From Swiss-Prot:
Entry function: Auxillary component of the N-terminal acetyltransferase C (NatC) complex which catalyzes acetylation of N-terminal methionine residues.
UniProt keyword Zinc, yes or no: no
Protein name per UniProt: N-alpha-acetyltransferase 38-A, NatC auxiliary subunit
Encoding gene (name): naa38-a
InterPro entries membership: LSM_dom_sf, LSMD1_Sm, Sm, Sm_dom_euk/arc, snRNP_SmB/NAA38-like
UniProt-annotated location(s): Cytoplasm
Lineage: Eukaryota, Metazoa, Chordata, Craniata, Vertebrata
Primary location recorded for the protein, binned into one broad class: cytoplasm
Amino acid sequence: MAAVLEENGCSRQSSPSAGDSDAEPGDTARHKLESLLNRNMRIEMTDGRSLIGCFLCTDRDCNVILGSAQEFLRPSDSFPVREPRVLGLAMVPGHHIVSIQVELESVTSPQYI
């Protein structure tokens, strides 16, 4: 059975079709996730909180583990700007994730001869 990446990033099992190419859709999804490992990302949650941290892993339920995570609360009228709360290692339940934004890598990286 081949794994198919759905729109929200979760995978589901499907039966193989006759017209499959050499690279299965599950392989593409796996490579995409592997390319995001150890990258900084911002996760927006359903309750308005934002978590920023280093992407370490995910599971079949779309839960995400962030390292060196910081929590930012949604600003309110009484407290317009709040300091981030340092969480360290944080697990974000997949059903609470609204959006994920990945930090761009630096344009140039040092080259060694």
